[in-house]
Curated annotation (Swiss-Prot):
Its main location: secreted. Belongs to the staphylokinase family. InterPro entries: SAK, SAK/SK_sf. SUPFAM superfamilies: Staphylokinase/streptokinase. Potent plasminogen activator that converts plasminogen into plasmin. It forms a 1:1 complex with plasmin, which in turn activates other plasminogen molecules. Gene3D superfamilies: 3.10.20.130. Keywords: Plasminogen activation, Secreted, Signal. It is found in: Secreted. This is Staphylokinase. Residues 1-27 form the signal peptide. It comes from the Bacteria. It holds the Pfam family Staphylokinase. The gene is sak. One of its GO terms (cellular component) is extracellular region.
Length: 163
C-alpha cells in the first residue's frame, strides 16, 4: 500500500512539474519575435523596421532637472503620422519606464525635433532629415531602400510636473 501511494505521488509530482515547464515554454513562445531582432545582450531586442527612439530629460518650469530616464524605442510604421500629441504620449511612456505614473508632460521644448540619419544610396552620402514637432505632425517616410532599421531620434528637454 505504501509503495502504491509513493508511486502515485511521484507520478502526480511529475505531471505537475511538466505542466509548469510547458506553460513557461508557451509563454516565452508567445513573444512576437518577428517585430524584434536580437542584439548583443540576450535580454535586448532591437526593433526591426523603423522606430522612434525617445531620449529626453525631464525639467521643471525653471529648467531644473527632475528626471533623466533611459532611452526607450517604439516601433513605428512608414506612412504613420506622428503628431505632437502622439509624441507626448511616447514621452510619457518613457517617463513611466523610470518613474511610473509620477510625472506628466507639460510641454516639449519648442526647438524639439525628430531626426533620422541614413546613408542615401542615390546621393552616395550620409543624409540627416529633421522633422518639426507640430499639432499637424509629419508622415514617417519609407526609407527601406536606404536602411533596414531607421531610427527616428527625439533627444530634447521636456517640461514635466508631478501628477
Amino acid at each position: 500500500m505504501l509503495k502504491r501511494g509513493l508511486l502515485f505521488l511521484t507520478v502526480l509530482l511529475l505531471l505537475f512539474s511538466f505542466s509548469s515547464i510547458t506553460n513557461e515554454v508557451s509563454a516565452s513562445s508567445s513573444f512576437d519575435k518577428g517585430k524584434y531582432k536580437k542584439g548583443d545582450d540576450a535580454s535586448y531586442f532591437e526593433p526591426t523596421g523603423p522606430y522612434l527612439m525617445v531620449n529626453v530629460t525631464g525639467v521643471d518650469g525653471k529648467g531644473n532637472e527632475l528626471l533623466s530616464p533611459h532611452y526607450v524605442e517604439f516601433p513605428i510604421k512608414p506612412g504613420t503620422t506622428l503628431t505632437k500629441e502622439k509624441i507626448e504620449y511616447y514621452v510619457e511612456w518613457a517617463l513611466d519606464a523610470t518613474a511610473y505614473k509620477e510625472f506628466r508632460v507639460v510641454e516639449l521644448d519648442p526647438s524639439a525635433k525628430i531626426e533620422v540619419t541614413y546613408y542615401d544610396k542615390n546621393k552616395k552620402k550620409e543624409e540627416t532629415k529633421s522633422f518639426p514637432i507640430t499639432e499637424k505632425g509629419f508622415v514617417v517616410p519609407d526609407l527601406s531602400e536606404h536602411i533596414k532599421n531607421p531610427g527616428f531620434n527625439l533627444i530634447t528637454k521636456v517640461i514635466i510636473e508631478k501628477k
